[in-house]
């Protein structure tokens, strides 16, 4: 398979077939650089060499009634994590200031649970109004399953993006969780879109899914028209259903990132949780397919130090995408 030729066809508007998608995942390691070259051709065409930086604020940790097999915050998990209720508006604002000062363009307010309470949405909404005024950051909320009126309130407050991952294929979903359905997740993304909030939805790779499942989730996100697609790689935490699962290697992770770029050529592809332990020394290559990363810690696991990420981007010759207020402050 000539990956560079397929990449050009994708740029010209082609949608790759399932056979071509599986050929990417099944490609030989000797073909990896050609595959990434093709992925970079697509990425460069739509995004140049800019990289979007994102930071997570874990606004509520633990106490989740859901049974997601990958999650240390699940009701079924025995992982020894820090647990706390929804944080204050002032704490959210303090995190936004850290994001601004560290050249993070998108600030992600994330909370555990099936869905937010009225109070949760009020706190986030009040914080977002001030964040937009003081720092001009793009704000992404990730609060669980969302109702129509909650989506409308978040939109009016200024929330730019809402994250609700599909996580895996429809076929594999019941293996990961039984406390909510695949359709529940799709419906939340559709509600977000209906109310004019940019949809963010992605996947977790390495949860005992097949390669066909990986292709199906990448294609489902294309059909859902998610603007931003976080690609997580399982960090199997002790105490969760998937503890001890080690199905990934760095080369396969790169093939997955390339696949998501070939199937979703115009979208923001973000290398997300688990990149440090699963991509290892090959992390920099991931940005030849992806154009976005998380900086700092994740929800209950540590990330790479921010200075290491900035150095990686500088070594690659990539440029951090700043907000208008950051450009005024730092340029």
UniProtKB/Swiss-Prot annotation:
Cofactor note: Binds 1 [4Fe-4S] cluster. The cluster is coordinated with 3 cysteines and an exchangeable S-adenosyl-L-methionine. Binds 1 [2Fe-2S] cluster. The cluster is coordinated with 3 cysteines and 1 arginine.
Pfam family, one: BATS
Domain Radical SAM core positions: 46-275
Keyword S-adenosyl-L-methionine: yes
Transmembrane segments: none
Record CDD domains: Radical_SAM
Protein's pathway: Cofactor biosynthesis; biotin biosynthesis; biotin from 7,8-diaminononanoate: step 2/2
Catalytic activity: (4R,5S)-dethiobiotin + (sulfur carrier)-SH + 2 reduced [2Fe-2S]-[ferredoxin] + 2 S-adenosyl-L-methionine = (sulfur carrier)-H + biotin + 2 5'-deoxyadenosine + 2 L-methionine + 2 oxidized [2Fe-2S]-[ferredoxin]
Quaternary assembly: Homodimer.
Protein's name according to its UniProt entry: Biotin synthase
Organism per entry: Lysinibacillus sphaericus (strain C3-41)
């Amino acid at each position: 398979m000539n990956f560079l030729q397929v990449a050009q066809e994708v740029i010209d508007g082609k949608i790759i077939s399932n056979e071509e998608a599986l050929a990417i995942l099944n490609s030989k390691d000797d073909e990896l650089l050609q595959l990434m070259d093709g992925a970079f051709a697509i990425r460069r065409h739509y995004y140049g060499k800019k990289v979007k930086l994102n930071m997570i604020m874990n606004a509520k940790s633990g106490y989740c009634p859901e049974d997601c097999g990958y999650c240390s915050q699940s009701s079924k998990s025995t992982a020894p994590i820090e647990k706390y209720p929804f944080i204050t508006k002032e704490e959210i604002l303090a995190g936004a200031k850290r994001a601004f000062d560290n050249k993070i363009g998108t600030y992600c307010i994330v909370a555990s649970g099936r869905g937010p309470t009225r109070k949760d949405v009020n706190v986030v909404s009040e914080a977002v109004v001030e964040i937009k005024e003081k720092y001009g950051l793009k704000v992404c909320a990730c609060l669980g399953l969302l109702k129509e009126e909650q989506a409308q309130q978040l939109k009016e407050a200024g929330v730019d993006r809402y994250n609700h991952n599909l996580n895996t294929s429809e076929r594999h979903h019941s293996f990961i969780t039984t406390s909510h359905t695949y359709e529940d997740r799709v419906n939340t993304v559709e509600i977000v879109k209906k109310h004019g909030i940019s949809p963010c939805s992605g996947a977790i790779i390495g949860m005992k899914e097949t390669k066909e499942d990986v292709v199906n989730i990448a294609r489902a996100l294309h059909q859902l028209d998610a603007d931003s697609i976080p690609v997580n790689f399982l960090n199997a935490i002790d105490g969760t259903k998937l503890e001890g699962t080690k199905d990934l290697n760095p080369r396969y992770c790169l093939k997955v990132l390339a696949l998501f770029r070939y199937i979703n050529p115009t979208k923001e592809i973000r290398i997300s949780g688990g990149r440090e332990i699963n991509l290892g020394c090959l992390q920099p290559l991931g940005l030849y397919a992806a154009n976005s990363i998380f900086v700092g810690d994740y929800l209950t696991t540590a990330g790479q130090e921010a200075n290491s990420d900035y150095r990686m981007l500088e070594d690659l010759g990539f440029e951090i995408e700043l907000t208008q207020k950051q450009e005024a402050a730092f340029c």
